A protein has these predicted regions:
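N-terminal (or domain-start) structured segment
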Residues: 21-123, 161, 170, 186-211, ...
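Positively charged n-region of N-terminal signal peptides that target proteins for export
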Residues: 1-4
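Short beta-strand/turn micro-motifs at beta-sheet edges
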Residues: 30-33, 124-128, 249-255
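Hinge/capping helix and adjacent helix->loop/strand transition within the periplasmic-binding protein
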Residues: 91-97, 104, 112-199, 248, ...
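A ligand-binding cleft/hinge motif common to bilobed small-molecule-binding domains
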Residues: 106-115, 180-184, 211-245, 322
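Bacterial N-terminal signal peptides
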Residues: 6-18
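An extracytoplasmic/periplasmic, membrane-proximal ligand-sensing/linker region
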Residues: 26, 38-40, 183, 224, ...
Length: 336
């Protein structure tokens, strides 16, 4: 417990000056040929179809296909908390045809907690563009009869058995949030990982598991239907469309002001001119009204970053979440 809380303490210690000291990756490569892209492009989504990463991959595939006049296909390659699909991209030729939807599970938590990670999350990738982030919502099945996070904590303390909670998978931000809450409040929560949010929420709404830590994207319809009760959200401010839902910060969990994020990366040593063009096109996509509308509907907040800024962001997230991930996952074993 003390190891995990110490790791969380490191999160708040990261400041702007710390971020400024982190060097961005500067891949060395030749400029792209004048005919690039000369063949179909592939965006690997290292998660199953139906989740936020999949939606973002398909949005970007459509935009880039139109922008470059080339076919762009989306390939779902889930497994090992996103490392299977990500490794395929890390080992691909840097010819501008293969990319990945990157994020916290695959490029921050999994590499930090695996003794045999098949890639370095910074050195083996060209980090091209940040897309956006969404907060985690703590939910309870209506049959549990709790209406607040404090009631959930009290219920867990009264229970003689560990209370199961679901997340989209090992190393997801929902996993991290749940593990921290368990130790902070000295309650017994058992992490039940799934291969994506769609499968996790299916069992949650069926009542097979009583607690969830997932994005607003996957839980909102069931919260509005009354099947799930929203208890707290990890955003810095309350949702405009659900102002009654308190933030974790308000409830005394200031370390958990955070979002799970999605981004666009490719193999290391992509030509800088190519990286810049891709960054510009993705930022254009984020400005498109239809794209903004789709992402806002899923509570995904976009932000534009240059490739250098995004690379520094990834490095900062590794320093921020890596120690916490090692403490949480190491404490409960790699099987979860």
């Amino acid at each position: 417990m003390h190891r995990l809380l110490a790791a969380v303490g490191m999160i708040g210690a990261l400041t702007g000056s710390t971020l400024a000291q982190i060097a961005g990756a500067q891949p060395s490569a030749q400029a792209p040929g004048p005919t690039w892209p000369s063949k179909a492009m592939r965006i690997v989504v290292p998660w199953p179809p139906g989740g936020s990463a999949d939606m973002i991959g398909r949005i970007l595939a459509e935009h880039l296909g139109n922008a470059f006049g080339q076919s762009v296909v989306v390939e779902n390659r889930p497994g090992a908390s996103g490392m299977v699909g990500s490794a395929a991209v890390a080992h691909a030729d840097p010819d501008g045809s293969t990319f990945v939807i990157s994020g916290i599970p695959s490029h921050v938590v999994a590499p930090a907690t695996s003794a045999s990670a098949p890639f370095d999350p910074v050195k083996d990738f060209t980090h091209i563009a940040y897309v956006g982030g969404a907060p985690i919502v703590i939910t309870a099945h209506a049959s549990l009869g709790v209406r607040s996070l404090s009631e959930l904590v009290a219920s867990a303390r009264r229970s003689g058995n560990a209370m199961g909670y679901v997340s989209p998978g090992v190393g997801s931000l929902g996993h991290m949030v749940g593990e921290y809450l368990a130790r902070k409040d000295a309650i017994r929560l058992e992490h039940i990982p799934y291969k994506g949010g769609v499968q996790a929420v299916t069992d949650l709404i069926a009542g097979h598991v009583k607690v969830g830590a997932m994005t607003w994207t996957t839980t909102r319809p069931h919260i509005r239907a009354g099947t799930l009760t929203a208890l707290a959200v990890s955003s810095a401010r309350r949702f405009a469309d659900d102002p009654g839902l308190p933030t974790l910060q308000e409830l005394g969990y200031g370390e958990l002001v955070t979002t799970t994020w999605w981004s666009f990366s490719g193999p290391a040593k992509l030509p800088p001119d190519m990286v810049q063009r891709l960054n510009q096109e993705i930022n254009k996509a984020l400005d498109a009204p239809d794209v903004r509308r789709k992402l806002e509907q899923e509570a995904i907040v976009t932000e534009k970053m240059s490739p250098a800024q995004f690379t520094r962001f990834v490095e900062t997230e590794i320093g921020k979440w890596g120690p916490l991930a090692k403490a949480a996952i190491g404490a409960q074993g790699s099987g979860n």
